[in-house]
């Protein structure tokens, strides 16, 4: 079994669509092995998104991710990373395929409802950023 990391972003929490996202995750065959609701500080968001530090959108991204609560998740299934990326859909909801979370619930490129690890290396950094082993069942 493979594990991946996911975040339900502040825009989705604000719009009360967390339950819809969780339903789509479970319908997609994922097992939720870790879940917590947290509010990132700007510093924590900067640490999490450090790989984008030199990108022009870094400041706006960190401000957005720290503006309200998020739901951090660890998902498990065979091919979890690729399957989660497929279920999320394209970054821009306008370009996402029907049946994906971003097509159904995304508002814009920034307010696109969810985040997901893009590789095993990313997952191995992102999961322990939010969870210790005792929190994963």
UniProtKB/Swiss-Prot annotation:
It comes from Geobacter sp. (strain M21). InterPro entries: NDK-like_dom, NDK-like_dom_sf, Nucleoside_diP_kinase, Nucleoside_diP_kinase_AS. It is found in: Cytoplasm. Its cofactor is Mg(2+). GO terms for cellular component: cytoplasm. One of its GO terms (biological process) is GTP biosynthetic process. Keywords: ATP-binding, Cytoplasm, Kinase, Magnesium, Metal-binding, Nucleotide metabolism, Nucleotide-binding, Phosphoprotein, Transferase. GO terms for molecular function: ATP binding; metal ion binding; nucleoside diphosphate kinase activity. Its EC number is 2.7.4.6. It catalyses: a 2'-deoxyribonucleoside 5'-diphosphate + ATP = a 2'-deoxyribonucleoside 5'-triphosphate + ADP; a ribonucleoside 5'-diphosphate + ATP = a ribonucleoside 5'-triphosphate + ADP. Its main location: cytoplasm. Homotetramer. This is Nucleoside diphosphate kinase. Pfam families: NDK (PF00334).
